[in-house]
C-alpha cells in the first residue's frame, strides 16, 4: 500500500465505469490508498476486500437509486464520486469504419447512445449521489472530461486508420465541463466540491499509424502511461485540494497549447 494521501484511507469511493480501461486504473489507485471502492458498471468484476461491485446501468435513475438505498440502509457515507463512465470509439488495427462516424452520416442512434452514457449518466449519478452528499454536507465529485473537451479533435491524426473521431465524444466531454462548473457552484455552500480533469489519451496498443501521428501533436511526444493520472485524481479527491472547486485540470502532454 502506497499512502501518498493518508486522508483517503477508509473513505468510500463510487466509481462509474470502474471496470473500463481508465476506470480500472482509478479503482486501483484508490484501493492502494486503503479506500473502500464501489464500482458501478455493466461489466461484472471480481470483488475483493474493500471493492464492491454493483451491476448498474447509470443511464437509468432506478438503478442508481437502488445503489443509494444500499448506502442508506448500511449507513455508509459517500465521500467521493468519480464520473468515469463513457463510450469512446477508438482506432484499431485493420479498423473498418462501418458505423460511418463522419458528421454527414453519423447516426442518431449512436449519437443518443454516446450522450446517454457519457453525459446523462454523469448527470444522473451526480444528481442521485451528490444530493446525498449535500444532505451530509460533505463530499467530492470528480468528473473525467478530456483534452477533447477543451479543443476539437484533430482529424489528421487518424489519417490512414480508416477512422474519424465522432462528434458525440467531443460534445460529451465539453458537456462534462459545463456540468462540473454548475455542480461546483450549486453545492458549494453544502461543502460538496466538484472538479474535473481533462486528460489526453492513454497508450493501449493503438493502431500504429495513429500512434505515429498523435506523437506529432503532443509536445511531450508520447501518449500518457496508464497510471500517469493516478496522483492527480487522488489529489483532487483529498484534503490537499480542499480550496479547489469548479476547476478543470488539463493534463495532456501539452496537446491543447499548440
Regions found by a protein language model. Give the residues of each.
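Canonical Rossmann dinucleotide-binding motif of NAD(H)/NADP(H)-dependent dehydrogenases/reductases
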Residues: 5-36
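Short, small/polar-rich loop/turn modules that mediate ligand/substrate recognition or access, typified
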Residues: 188-193, 244-246
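Catalytic loop of short-chain dehydrogenase/reductase
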Residues: 102-108, 142-175, 180-189, 202
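A conserved structural motif in NAD(P)-dependent oxidoreductases
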Residues: 218-229, 240
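Amphipathic alpha-helical dimer-interface segment in Rossmann-like NAD(P)H-dependent oxidoreductases
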Residues: 108, 113-135, 148-149, 184-185, ...
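Catalytic Tyr-X3-Lys loop
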Residues: 87, 99-124, 138, 142, ...
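Short C-terminal tail/terminal secondary-structure segment
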Residues: 2, 160, 234, 245-258
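Conserved NAD(P)H cofactor-binding loop of Rossmann-fold oxidoreductase domains
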Residues: 84-99, 254
Amino acid at each position: 500500500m502506497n499512502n501518498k494521501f493518508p486522508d483517503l484511507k477508509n473513505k468510500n469511493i463510487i466509481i462509474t465505469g470502474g471496470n473500463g480501461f481508465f476506470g480500472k486504473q482509478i479503482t486501483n489507485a484508490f484501493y492502494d490508498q486503503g479506500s473502500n471502492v464501489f464500482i458501478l458498471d455493466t461489466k461484472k468484476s471480481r470483488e475483493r476486500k474493500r471493492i464492491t461491485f454493483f451491476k448498474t446501468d447509470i443511464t437509468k435513475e432506478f438503478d442508481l437509486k437502488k445503489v443509494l438505498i444500499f448506502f442508506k440502509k448500511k449507513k455508509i457515507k459517500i465521500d467521493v464520486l468519480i464520473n468515469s463512465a463513457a463510450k469512446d470509439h477508438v482506432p484499431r488495427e485493420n479498423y473498418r469504419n462501418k458505423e460511418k462516424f463522419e458528421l454527414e452520416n453519423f447516426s442518431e442512434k449512436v449519437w443518443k447512445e454516446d450522450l446517454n452514457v457519457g453525459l446523462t449518466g454523469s448527470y444522473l449519478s451526480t444528481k442521485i449521489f451528490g444530493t446525498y452528499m449535500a444532505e451530509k454536507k460533505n463530499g467530492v465529485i470528480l468528473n473525467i472530461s478530456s483534452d477533447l473537451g477543451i479543443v476539437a479533435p484533430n482529424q489528421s491524426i487518424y489519417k490512414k486508420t480508416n477512422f474519424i473521431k465522432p462528434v458525440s465524444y467531443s460534445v460529451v466531454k465539453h458537456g462534462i465541463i459545463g456540468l462540473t462548473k454548475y455542480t461546483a457552484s450549486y453545492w458549494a455552500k453544502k461543502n460538496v466540491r466538484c472538479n474535473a480533469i481533462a486528460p489526453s489519451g492513454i497508450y493501449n496498443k493503438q493502431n500504429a499509424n495513429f500512434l505515429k501521428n498523435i506523437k506529432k501533436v503532443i509536445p511531450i511526444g508520447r501518449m500518457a502511461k496508464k497510471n500517469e493520472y493516478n496522483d492527480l485524481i487522488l489529489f483532487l479527491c483529498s484534503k490537499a485540494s480542499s480550496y479547489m472547486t469548479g476547476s478543470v485540470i488539463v493534463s495532456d502532454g501539452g496537446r491543447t497549447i499548440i
